[in-house]
Amino acid sequence: MRDKITVIGSLNYDVILKIARLPEMGETFHADDVAFSAGGKGANQAVQAAKLGVPTYMVGCVGEDANGEILISEAKKYGVHTEYIRKVQEPTGMGVVNALQDGSVFAVIVKGANYAVTKEDIDHAEDLLKESAIVILQMEIPQEINMYAIDKAKEAGCKVLLNAAPAADIPEEYLKKVDILVVNEVEAAYYLHSEIDTIEKAKEGALQMSGELCNACIFTLGKEGSVVAQNGEVAFIPSKKVDAVESTGAGDSFIGATGYALIHGMDLVKACEFATGCSAIT
């Protein structure tokens, strides 16, 4: 029985600035606080799946530096298998996150070692893919590596979940190979060339995307919830109402939890309902 999740993607050392508002152009603005955290979409997603109890493996690169050591140590602490993380000469990837009091975030990432991932790294994990039920990908490593990983995952019989974030052009033939495409409203607007600013527009867009570009898709809508579309049907899943302290990583938690739920036999709607609860308490 295949019971593993393989996450291929990014590991970043995050600097999180707690601020009351974004500074104006040319303005120097004091942050209220600063925090340092292990991050990167790939690593965050892997940690959530591992915390829920799924055997989870991370494939990616970090630098031969202190930040890289921290990221590997943190992943191990939460149960992520790290033997497929390679150390390279490039500096470890970094994220700078501006976190506002209302829970919204504005982030910038430095590619660093994440763009050192090669086809050989994917080939090295070939046996692992054959034992994995799901491969999770994001868009924080080179696109050609993602496409190669999709091909290898499908050859190995894995279900592929692609978190198309940050949004970038993807050849349609590869989108159609993806089993589940996950985007937020900004990324959805990028691919549909149409603004997604209401739940109804999200439902319409998800139906369009699942019909034209991929097999199934999930639109995450922040505090509103999410929309799931597949096989010509669409469902809206409202968020769990909590007081948002800071939402960094909530979307990644959602994806890791979705992987867990799918491995445990839930259909996609039930999986997203489960993941919604997990991301609310991240």
Regions found by a protein language model. Name each.
Residues 1-61, 66-73, 77, 244-245:
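Glycine-rich phosphate/adenosyl-contacting loop at the front of the ribokinase-like
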Residues 74-89:
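A glycine-rich helix N-cap at a beta->alpha junction
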Residues 134-204, 224-226:
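Conserved beta-alpha-beta core of the PfkB/ribokinase-like small-molecule kinase fold
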Residues 2-5, 169, 199-282:
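Conserved phosphate-binding/catalytic region of the ribokinase-like
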Residues 46-55, 99-100, 261-265:
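Alpha-helix C-terminal capping segments
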Residues 127-128, 174, 210:
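Structural alpha-helical scaffold elements that stabilize or flank donor/cofactor-binding regions
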Residues 61, 87, 97-134, 139:
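Conserved phosphate-binding/catalytic loop of the ribokinase/pfkB sugar-kinase fold
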